[in-house]
Amino acid sequence: MKIMKYIVPALLGGMLTLQSCEHFLDTKPTETYSEELVWGSRSTADAFVLRTYPDILGLYHDFWGDDQITLNTILRQSCPGEARDLINREHDFGFNKFSIIRRCNLIIEQASASTALSDLDKKELVAEGKMLRAMIYYYQAKHCGRVIWVDRVLQVDDEFNLPLTESIDRTYDLILSDLDDAIAGLPEEYPAGRANANAARALKSEVCLTAAAYTTDATRKKTLWEQAVVAVDAIQGYSLDANYGGMFNQENSYSSTEIILARYFSKENTNGGDTYMQTVIPNQGNDNLKKLGRGPLFKKDWVF
């Protein structure tokens, strides 16, 4: 009896311990999020979409980085090594953006397939994904002309030997198709810093003008010009801001009547240093130009 008295509680304790261990080990990763969670509500889906913006908008305001390999700015004069020696056949010149393209394709596919999102949410998110994808490929098209167009989320067993678009015209046709879908699906108004239908129209007008510049087909060129005009005429609700300086600080940037799409930085987590203006304007005075026999002279001497 004494043996049973001690064995039975021990067995029960062991069973409870094993059961506890089983639940203890049955955990989920805490540093990652499942697709079901991300696309299970509009708020979590928005969080994924908004995290995609910085990688894309940065390509549109870091223009001086590309200019360092051209003769366009003073920046090249300060980095001849980078401009000449480091820019070789191994430099991708903006071609390798496939991780960001994958995020755009995830937005399009996962939002469309979600059973938790409303039809309106799906429509807006898919359109936003296409807008972002068009922005990436337009950036690449300006650099490379022909691109590897990936319009789905690639899996490990997919064929990765993907071809370039057959022509520059085809590249721009695909970009414009995405922009047309974005215009049709995006709301007319969105919170500051997020693309709306007007932002898509504005980008479409620029894409049309760029595409027209690179086509050799006169009929296509005329059609693209006409599409650019239609896109611009359809933009409503914006006007030149009387407070120009306010657009570039917290005084007026969020409520400006001129800004269609911008990337915003908070003073709470942003440190300022060199400005883009310093890298694109020569830090020279007229006295130096005269000494070197150069001209024309600056209307405003010593900008900095």
Would you name each region that the model predicts?
Residues 1-10:
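Bacterial N-terminal signal peptides that target proteins for export
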Residues 22-77, 172, 176, 180-181, ...:
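An aromatic- and glycine-enriched ligand-binding surface/loop that stacks and positions planar moieties
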Residues 18-20:
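C-terminal motif of bacterial Sec signal peptides marking the signal peptidase cleavage site
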Residues 148-153, 185-193, 240-247:
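Glycine- and aromatic-rich loop/turn segments at beta-sheet edges
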Residues 146-169, 214-226:
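Short coil/linker segments at helix-helix boundaries
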Residues 139, 143-146, 152, 185, ...:
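Alpha-solenoid helical repeat scaffolds
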Residues 34, 41-58, 75-144, 160-173, ...:
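Conserved, well-structured interaction surfaces
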Residues 12-16:
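Hydrophobic helical h-region of N-terminal Sec-dependent signal peptides
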